[in-house]
């Protein structure tokens, strides 16, 4: 089961990460890579020559993947060189940084030891627009105080994304007799190029506290803005992260997502999944599900177990078997993906559902 943060832990971590941020934009010809031995294996250090001195970043797995993709180095080959031919990897990276020069934004955290390397979190375009978690806390969270009864549910900050869910206990409906759901909201963001900032409905099933996100009714914003001109470290004052128009829309979206009208629309669609074609062969159906939606074998077996134990072979039963399995995974990013899959199943056209049910 993935760990989550309390409301207080969430705020503390957002502030801690914001204070530790170090973002640099520079021409790639002013960068160089060094591969050296680390505690858990070889690591890639990226040195960036800036007017303020050399900024050193030890790239994490996510940033290494972005560098590999941007430089046209197949990820499997990149990882093999990292392990078996570190010198070759450094030469490869340096060659393409200088042979095909571009301006890139490196997002990182400051070194914890003087003279050491910081953490390289992301390798991004110089048009990347920061809409960071600290801005969400400052500009969106205060709206929650204006919504009576809104209650914090869970949050997490992974290496690539931030998630926050809240629910509205006063707004709930039954999908079928004795099976109620509650309205909620999810705010999701990535500071490192792994997705848009989105505000979506979140549905909580009260019988087993399964969660489900509803992206069809979400509002999202891409992290794309004007080119960053200065080749230096930069702060909130030197970029256009302060997009007041967007944040005003975001605040209104929070209220819209939590409206009774929006909730009733979602409930009506979920209620339709109770009826219709029933699953005829659970094993075959979950195998088809796993193939179509890229579930692991462990996940498929978990969904099958939940489906059989739940005793509901309807579309509603299957989507809840999936969201129940989401609670069993150790990685919160994967949990969120499976919770989103629940809504994908609820949204399947009748013909596609029938094909899955009769597999």
Positions of PLM-derived features:
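Feature for intrinsically disordered/low-complexity regulatory segments and propeptides
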Residues: 1-139, 147
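Intrinsic disorder/low-complexity polar-acidic segments
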Residues: 130-359
């Amino acid at each position: 089961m993935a760990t989550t943060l309390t409301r207080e832990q969430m705020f503390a971590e957002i502030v801690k990460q914001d204070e530790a941020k170090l973002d640099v934009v520079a021409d790639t010809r002013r960068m160089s890579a060094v591969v050296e031995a680390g505690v858990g294996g070889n690591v890639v250090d990226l040195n960036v020559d800036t007017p303020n001195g050399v900024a050193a970043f030890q790239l994490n797995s996510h940033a290494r993947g972005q560098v590999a993709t941007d430089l046209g180095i197949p990820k499997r080959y990149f990882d093999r060189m990292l392990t078996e031919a570190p010198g070759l990897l450094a030469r490869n990276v340096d060659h393409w940084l200088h042979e095909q020069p571009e301006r890139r934004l490196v997002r990182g955290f400051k070194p914890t030891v003087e003279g050491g390397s910081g953490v390289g979190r992301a390798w991004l375009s110089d048009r990347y627009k920061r809409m960071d978690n600290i801005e969400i806390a400052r500009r969106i969270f205060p709206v929650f105080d204006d919504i009576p009864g809104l209650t914090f549910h869970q949050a997490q900050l992974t290496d690539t994304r931030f998630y926050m869910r809240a629910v509205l206990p006063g707004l709930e409906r039954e999908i079928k007799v004795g099976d109620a759901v509650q309205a909620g909201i999810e705010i999701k963001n990535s500071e490192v190029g792994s997705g848009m900032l989105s505000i979506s409905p979140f549905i909580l099933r009260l019988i087993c506290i399964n969660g489900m996100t509803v992206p069809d009714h979400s509002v999202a914003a891409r992290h794309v803005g004007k080119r960053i001109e200065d080749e230096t470290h930069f702060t909130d004052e030197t970029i256009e992260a302060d997009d007041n128009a967007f944040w005003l829309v975001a605040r209104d979206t929070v209220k819209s997502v939590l409206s009774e009208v929006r909730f009733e629309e979602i409930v009506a669609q979920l209620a339709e999944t109770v009826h219709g074609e029933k699953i005829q062969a659970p094993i075959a159906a979950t195998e088809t599900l796993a193939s179509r939606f890229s579930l692991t074998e462990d996940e498929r077996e978990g969904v099958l177990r939940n489906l059989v134990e739940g005793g509901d072979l309807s579309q509603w039963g299957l989507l809840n078997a999936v969201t129940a399995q989401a609670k069993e995974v150790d990685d919160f990013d994967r949990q969120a993906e499976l919770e989103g899959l629940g809504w994908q199943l609820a949204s399947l056209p009748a013909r596609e559902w029938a094909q899955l049910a009769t597999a």
